[in-house]
Amino acid sequence: RHYAAMGHRGLGNGVMLDASTVATATVPHYGDDGQTLTQGMSLGYMLGGMSADSLTGWRFAPWHGAFGHDGSGGRAGMYCPKYDLAIALAKNAHTPSGFALATWSLVVRAIADALGLPVDVD
């Protein structure tokens, strides 16, 4: 519900973020040199569609402009403005940190396939 409320239509009686804040939240922040993308993050959110060599890589979300965050043990959520799509995953067992996004990636791909959405990563 948190990420669904970020959509342009909001959820229930309100919109959590206005369009300008969503636009700002999807702009990658670069290193001190202004050119090196080291983390694939913006405003504390992990960004989708990042290159494989960034900290988050494309594994978080395959769509440019998608943003969200994972949590301890493999829980994650994201919103993709391009497709007005929110996805959340809550697991009932802790996953070791090296594998935290493994299930998430499978879930996101399955949802993309089911909805006929392209996986538009570089």
Q: Which residues fall in each region the model found?
A:
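Catalytic loop of the DD-peptidase/beta-lactamase superfamily, centered on the K-T-G motif
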Residues: 1-122
